[in-house]
Each structure stands twice: as C-alpha cells, then as structure tokens.
C-alpha cells in the first residue's frame, strides 16, 4: 500500500511518462483523493452489531490481525489496560452500589484517554500495520468520512476521541440517568437513580469482572461495560434486522444491478415513517397515508425502488418498527413487489431518515448523482422544504452536516433531493442509530 506521494516518487524513479502522472492524479481526484470511500469496501463485523455501528474503530482493532497484534504488544497501551483491570478488581470490594465508582473502574480516565490518543498517533507514524488500518479500513469504509481531509494520524486520533465521546454518552444515559439528545424516546428503561437499578449496576460490575482475563485491548473494559448497559435497558435497536443485506433487503440487492435507471425520473422514493403514539398500534394514520402516497408514485413508474425509513420509536420501547410495518402494507395492500423495497428500520428522526437513506444509496450501488424523491404527507414536506421551519439548522445542530441537497418541491407531497456522501459517517452520540 502506497500513499499518493509515494506512487508519484516511484513513477518518477522509473521514468514513467507524464500520462501516468495524469492518470494517477485523475484516479485520486475522482475517488480516494476526494474522500477515500470505496463503494466496494465491505464492513467488518464483531460479535456485536451495536459495537460495529457505534465503535467501528474498536471492531477494526479486534478483527484486523496485524493491527490487533501491534496494539496488544504495545507496552504503553497494555499498561493502560492493566490499570483498568486493577481498578475493576478493586471495585469488587470498594464500589458496592456506587455508580460513579463502577464507571471510574471500567472507563479510561481523562489522563489515560489522552495517553491513548498520543500513543495511537505515535504508532500510526511508525507502524505499517496501523498505517494500513487507516488506509485500508478507516478511509475506504466511509465510517469516518468527516475526517477525510485529515492526515492518517489525525484521522485515527479523531476516531478515538469520537469513540470516547460515544462511551461517555452511553454512561451518562444508561448508568447516570442523565438526559440525552432524545430523552423521551431513547432514555434508560429503568429509574437510573433508584436503588434497584444501582444494584443491577453492581451485579453487572461483578459479572464483567470475570471477563477481564479475556481482554487484551485497551478499549475493551469501557466498551463491554457500555454495551452491557445498553443490553440491560433492552436498547438493541441498532442491531435489529441485521444483517439487512442477507435478510430484509436481500431481494432488492439482487434486483439493483439489473435496473435500467434511464427509464425512471428518480433513483428512489424515500418514505419517512410516522410512529403511532398509542401502544399496540402497528401503523399510525399518518403512516397509512404515506404508504398510499408512495405506492401511487411507484406504480406510476417514478422510481424503481422505495426506501422505507423509520425505526422502533413511538411510543417508548414500542415493539413495532415503522419501516417494517410500512413494508407489510405496501406488499399486502398495494401490490408493491418485495424486490422494489429497501427498509431502514433504524432511523428515529427526520434528519436520520435522510442520512440513513443516503447511506443505503451509496452502499447499495444506487446512482447517487441521479435525482431522488422524498414523498410524505404535506405536513412533513412543508417542514422539510420551508426554510421557516429550520430543518437545515436542525440537521446542522444534530448531525453537524446536511445529509442531502434539496431541489424542487414538485407537489405538496414531494420534494426532490440528492444524497451527500458525508452521511456515511457513523455517529456514536446517537447509540440507538449511530
């Protein structure tokens, strides 16, 4: 694996003609030079989809053998791990039901986080295995695409800093009971400050203490603790319906390579969901209206594919996913074939309807430069398209970027858009749908 500068140097040394320089420049400017994302890259998986989506850096450290070996053998990082293990063992006799004590035992403290940040940078400068980790995984995966313009060292360090923020967010929400971004739908399932819950956390600490002998990487104590907290609260939404490519979206993926895109004015119709506010109701009245709208447009031939976006959102801890319920209705009531339906059963907000829809477009090989259509009830289209409702500002506040570029509002139920590739960036500050 060579950097662009190394390739140029090698070409110059071999006296390759100018056309080779031009070809290399064109190659990099069209692909990896711009953002590094490779649509042919296949994400690696650990035993936990929740970890994979929230902390893909950690999955890579576990699943890429050369990088894992480098990290395991490093004395500095191994020293941090040993310090954490020692605190956990001390916690067995000292923490009792003190939540902060258990958090301090499992999580790297600020000094350790800074030391890890520094050491990862040093390793990236001198170890080929860590350089390859960035160049062959972090960059082409798209999972860290917000940092595409950074150097390899800076990208790796930024990924670590972001992961630390994600761990802390989970600890705050599911151990300390602090209000997160969307507390009404994403909070702990138990009263976090109750003695009962504190006892649960104490038991979890003792349970995980038995696992410490199997941990060989610096991130594992905090990651295991965070994932355990989410499991205790039945917060596995990010993992539900995975692997989608082999399950719910399998038929669509088989169909996509055979689509004649020129026959359709739009690549996809994105359909945001609407969760019912009443328990035991699978599909809300608004959801039913939206299903009929998108079915009508599909049967008119406006697009070959429909993306249904909406997760397990309303009411709190609902057993129904908006996307799967809409899919049932489209197939059973409106005769839409399964091969034309892609589901995103994870989005929890209108912002992430667009973000997740964009991700599916880029990852599933749908032409991203072709216009797409968002179809919904008039109230939501007004909210999306009318500047006075500040939907763009909400995206910038919650995501840090716009996952779409809006074009014409062609009716009260439809607005045109194109996806933005920055949507591929994974967000551990939204752990139920990162």
What spans do the regions from the language model cover?
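Bacterial Sec-dependent N-terminal signal peptides
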Residues: 1-34
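A structural signal for short, hydrophobic/glycine-enriched beta-strand patches
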Residues: 35-434
């Amino acid at each position: 694996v060579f950097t662009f500068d190394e390739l140029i140097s090698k070409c110059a040394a071999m006296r390759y003609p100018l056309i080779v320089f031009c070809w290399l420049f064109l190659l990099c400017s069209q692909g990896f030079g711009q953002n590094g994302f490779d649509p042919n890259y296949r994400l690696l998986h650990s035993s936990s989809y929740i970890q994979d989506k929230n902390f893909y850096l950690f999955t890579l450290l576990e699943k890429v053998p050369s990088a894992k070996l480098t990290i395991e053998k490093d004395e500095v990082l191994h020293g941090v791990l040993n310090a954490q293990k020692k605190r956990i063992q001390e916690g067995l006799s000292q923490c009792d039901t003190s939540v902060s004590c258990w958090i301090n035992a499992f999580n790297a403290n600020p000094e350790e986080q800074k030391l890890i940040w520094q050491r990862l940078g040093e390793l990236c400068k001198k170890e080929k295995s860590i350089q390859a980790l960035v160049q062959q995984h972090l960059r082409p995966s798209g999972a860290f695409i917000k940092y595409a313009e950074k150097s390899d060292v800076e990208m790796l360090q930024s990924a670590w800093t972001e992961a630390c923020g994600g761990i802390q967010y989970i600890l705050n929400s599911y151990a300390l009971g602090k209000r997160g971004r969307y507390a009404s739908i994403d909070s702990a399932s138990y009263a976090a400050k109750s003695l009962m819950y504190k006892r649960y956390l104490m038991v979890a600490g003792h349970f995980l203490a038995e696992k410490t002998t199997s941990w060989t990487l610096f991130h594992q104590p905090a990651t295991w603790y965070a994932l355990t907290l989410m499991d205790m609260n039945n917060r596995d939404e990010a993992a539900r319906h995975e692997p989608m490519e082999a399950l719910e979206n399998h038929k669509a993926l088989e169909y996509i390579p055979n689509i004649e895109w020129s026959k359709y004015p739009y690549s996809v119709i994105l359909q945001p969901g609407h969760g019912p506010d009443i328990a035991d109701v699978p599909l809300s009245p608004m959801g039913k209206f939206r299903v009929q709208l998108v079915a009508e447009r599909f049967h008119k031939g406006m697009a070959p594919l429909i993306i249904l976006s909406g997760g397990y959102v309303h009411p709190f801890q609902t057993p129904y996913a908006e996307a799967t319920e809409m899919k049932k209705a489209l197939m059973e009531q409106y005769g839409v074939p399964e091969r034309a339906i892609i589901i995103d059963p994870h989005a929890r907000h209108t912002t992430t309807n667009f973000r997740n829809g964009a991700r599916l477009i880029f990852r599933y090989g749908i032409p991203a430069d072709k216009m797409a259509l968002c179809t919904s009830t008039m109230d939501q289209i007004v909210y999306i398209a009318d500047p006075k409702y500040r939907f763009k500002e909400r995206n910038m506040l919650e995501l840090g970027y716009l996952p779409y570029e809006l074009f014409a509002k062609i009716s009260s139920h439809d607005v045109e858009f194109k996806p933005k590739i920055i949507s591929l960036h994974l967000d551990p500050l939204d752990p139920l749908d990162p």
